[in-house]
Amino acid sequence: MKLENFFSKAMFCAAIVAMSVTIASCTDNDDTAGDDSQPTPIDAGPTYTDKMVAVNRDGNAYGQVSLRFYSDMLSVAYISIADFHKLMTGGDVMKVTRQGDLYLLATRNGTATVDVKADYLHSTTYAGFVDLMWMTASDLAPNTMYDGSKYIKFVKLENVSTFKPTSGVRLDFGKYSIDLHDDGSNVYFPFATLADIYSDCNFHNAAYHDDLVIVSTKLDIYTINTIAPEYAAKPYQRTDVTADMAKFRYQELCFVFDNLFGYPGRTIMEQNGMAEKGFDAALDAVQNGKVVKRLLQSTNNMDFAWGRMAMHYLIYDGGHTSFGALSGVPKDIQDAYVKSVLSASDQYPEASNMYKEWVKEDEERSKLEKKLGDLRTQAYGDVLYKANTAKTTGVIIINSFMEMDEAAWNKYYASQKTDADWQELMKSYKKDVFIGFLYGLAQAKADGVKNLVLDITLNGGGSCDIVGADVALLRKNRTVQFWSQDALEGNNKIATYFVDTNFDGVFDEKDDTNPKFDCSDMKIAVLSSKVAYSCGHQFPTLMKDYGFPIMGERSGGGTCCIQVMQTADGQNFMISTYRDRSTDKNFANTDAGITPTEGYAFGYDHFYDLDFLTTKLQR
């Protein structure tokens, strides 16, 4: 794969209160009754300067917010956590109560205690404390997956057990030399630290640099860049950062990977003890890791760029964790940045070699993807559905769970839902992968096939909404469950959803008894490959748990959802997050891939041979 692709390839509400005034104080404080004096700070920190900074929220001017700059770290912006919470939520108030030398923070779904002397935050309801999913839909539980599709509905989330001993979440900022401060009634964190803590699987995130705060609440990985592209490009145009920013930038990376990473299990850093001894010590254990550390700690942004390049290899998990994300930045600036990095490669032999190792891995996957694509095209042509001559076996091709035609679904669900309305919806079968799946089911039912293969051999992932809806229809049951873990809290979770399988706009028992397509008379199997990743891996995981055979070869893994972040100076990256790490129904790690059902494994020469697949399904 060319280096240019490294920078561009992504492997992957509650009502917003309009705000045009300055956010001067958004804390509901509870101090000693009858005492009008300013409380004495516990850790005021060194001298500081407050600065009013403009806010852009989802592309709209959103007033100003006060940021604080302490004299020992003049380049690092701090913000009251209550102000930050109000920014992210569009007006929700965090209640801050001082209790001796501690602060109790309360949001609508959780609480946390902060010790500014010892620089830590502790919470027994952490997922709820930082929860923003209620902004997407009011009934969503913290850390649930939902992309807003009208045909699937969240029902409940159950924490059924734990997989590690825990007395709550403790974030020890002092371990990373991240100082917390207060003014007697408010608690101040680095802006970048709070942005990392609050970012979630629905891509709510924020950034500050160059005198502007950007907040994104849109369901898109790179919205924070597309909101203000020229602004997003500025960190990549700088040759250097200050010494205090370089130090903090590295320490914040250490904090993120020690605490917020999902630990899928496959990365070189994990194999070198990152979970046990931390990011910094794991770098020391990796060959040439100390060189990478030096680059990541440098004030020189070319050094830092090559540190990022090396880390992309060391933390490579198939694509969910990536340091090569520039999408949304103006193309001319992207091109100039890539050119400058390319021209400097000889100056970074160790990092360059690591990058080349990553290229080898990615090229192998790309070669396999092309090979399978060519084989399938030769066998079927460019189609979404194919049946054998005898019409006994059909195959539905599902290359992605990503593409959605929201307008088509909105129009359908607002209609009378007549046959004509349904046929109008079906016209979007090439633009919406779930509609494409329904189109394939309609063809299979019309052909009267008794064997159905779901071909996900080239599926790189997408939305859990579509995965869940597909599974519900195939098993003729409106209920679909997702098994997963919260890697930070240590919980084993089951998320339950209902699917509107008859597409009448109502979630009820008719979805069990009278679905749009009844597949119960078919023998159904999933055809998988190592290319199938992320939701392309989750689909065979669920199908196997629900008793359907998996054919071909093991899937490609990719169990954690994505959390989008920025480095402390504003450069994009994303990680496999702790918030949701999918498992099988026994809460076993599946990142190595879902293996075929016994007797259903076979070579690529049989993948697209419908007669061969028929014999397998008729066993």
What is each stretch, according to the model?
Residues 3, 19-44:
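Bacterial Sec-dependent N-terminal signal peptides
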Residues 67-78:
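Short, contiguous acidic and Ser/Thr-rich linear segments
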Residues 109, 113, 125-452, 458-460, ...:
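Flexible, low-complexity junctional segments that flank or bridge functional domains
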Residues 33-66, 234-238:
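N-terminal low-complexity, Pro/Thr/Ser-rich intrinsically disordered segments
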Residues 87-121, 203-209:
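Extended intrinsically disordered, low-complexity coil regions enriched in Ser, Thr, Gly, Ala
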Residues 229-240, 247-250, 254, 391, ...:
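C-terminal "post-core" interaction segments
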Residues 2-13:
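Bacterial N-terminal signal peptides that target proteins for export
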Residues 76-92, 187-201:
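Amphipathic, non-transmembrane alpha-helical segments in extracytoplasmic/periplasmic proteins
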